[in-house]
Amino acid sequence: MNRKILHLNNSHIFLIGMMGSGKTTIGQLLAKKIMLPFIDTDAMIEHSEGLSIQEIFSTKGEEYFRSLEVKCLENILNSKSGQIVACGGGLPIISGVMEQMKRAGIVVFLASDPELAYNRIQAQSNRPLLGQIESFRQLYNSRIQTYKNANITCAANGTPNEVVLLVLNALTQFEF
């Protein structure tokens, strides 16, 4: 393991990108490789609310959900040790959030082709804000500029293991 990566124990690695970009899968594999705890903000919210993300959106609305995301991020930022964090796709879009994440660690944008991401999640019924491919592309286009402000951008069109290797390589080259 690269010496730089071993020094990440006090820094968070935030994985951002569209739903379907592989944040959870890549995050879990990456956490095993570099021996840091893994957190998925959507899973944390579902657990604390006792509802799926889709149910939260449909019963309480997007604004309420975004407030839960901010609270979840605050809890993560208060942690004393580094973690791999799979962020909900809209979390970095919230005003000030990207800056907070960059101060607390490294933000990695998992850049996947919108059509590939859409196809990965099309069969899942628990995803909010997902309609036809055109609306998915519009959502992607509305978020891409913010995503590009990440510290690191990695192509996420390959297999999970290929993407993990790309992320690890990028982390070893990142200037702290």
Identify the meaning behind each predicted range.
Residues T24:
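Walker A/P-loop
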Residues T41-G90, S95-Q100, T146:
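ATP-dependent small-molecule kinase phosphotransfer cores
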Residues M18:
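P-loop (Walker A) phosphate-binding loop of NTP-binding proteins
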Residues L15:
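Hydrophobic anchor at the beta1->P-loop junction of P-loop NTPases
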Residues N2-L8, L29, K33, I144-F176:
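NTP-dependent small-molecule kinase module
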Residues A104-Q145:
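A glycine- and Lys/Arg-enriched "phosphate-lid" helix/loop adjacent to the NTP-binding pocket
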Residues S21:
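ATP-binding Walker
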Residues G88-L91, D113-E115, T159:
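Short glycine-rich anion-binding loops that position phosphate/pyrophosphate groups of nucleotides
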